[in-house]
Amino acid sequence: MYRLLIICVLILASCKQEKPEIELTLAQKIANAHGFENWDKVKEFHFTFNVNKDSSHFGRSWVWKPKANEVTMLTEKDTITYNTSKIEQESINTDRAFINDKYWALLPFQLIWDTSATLGEPFKVEAPISKIELNKVTLTYPSDGGYTPGDAYDIFYYDYFIIKEWVYRKANANEPSMTNTFENYEKFSGIKIAQDHKKAEGNWNLNFTNIKVITE
């Protein structure tokens, strides 16, 4: 009886020590699959945003210091630095460009950061470009606030939560405004970034170069 009592006490003690597993949200699963758990160590994020269409090229470079709330844009004509925690009137256009370019680079993390947006329920569907069966979930923004209110994004991802394609629908229109791939993934200090975003047809590629992630 005494031995049985000891065993029961040990079992109860073991149960108390075991912490229940917390079920991650879909947004967390997608973000973590792309390295979000490493973001808190990031001091600087450098990247160049490019759009290549046929023989034309557009590009601008960024240095983002998230812990210092500082962003610098570098183009052939200008170098502009501003504080993201207090955006002055003269910095709005630069900030608008940064938000756009960062969104393409770090879409999985925006699922966590953009708390005002709504992430719907996922379901299986044929992806628009690859024509393979993927999970689809829609991210919808509120109709007021932000630079592009009311927009929606249909995100197509694998069962292991890596994003493969997306459809952008301006103002949550029924028809796609733009459809692109997420490809040529590479890790930078644990952050997984799709370096190329192509269309189904045409010589068009939105891509990232000069990526550098500096951590603490």
Language-model regions: role of each:
Residues M1-I7:
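Sec-dependent signal peptide recognition
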Residues I11-S14:
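C-terminal motif of bacterial Sec signal peptides marking the signal peptidase cleavage site
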Residues E18-E23, S85-D151, A173:
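Flexible, processing/modification-adjacent segments and terminal tails
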Residues K19, E23-I92, L119, P128:
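N-terminal mature ectodomain segment of secretory-pathway/periplasmic proteins
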Residues I22-L24, A33-E37, A117-E126, G202-E216:
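Intrinsically disordered terminal and processing segments
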Residues H46-T48, S61-V63, T72, T79-T81, ...:
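Ser/Thr- (and often Asn-) enriched beta-sheet segments in non-cytosolic proteins
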Residues I132-E216:
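Gly/Pro-enriched, hydrophobic low-complexity segments
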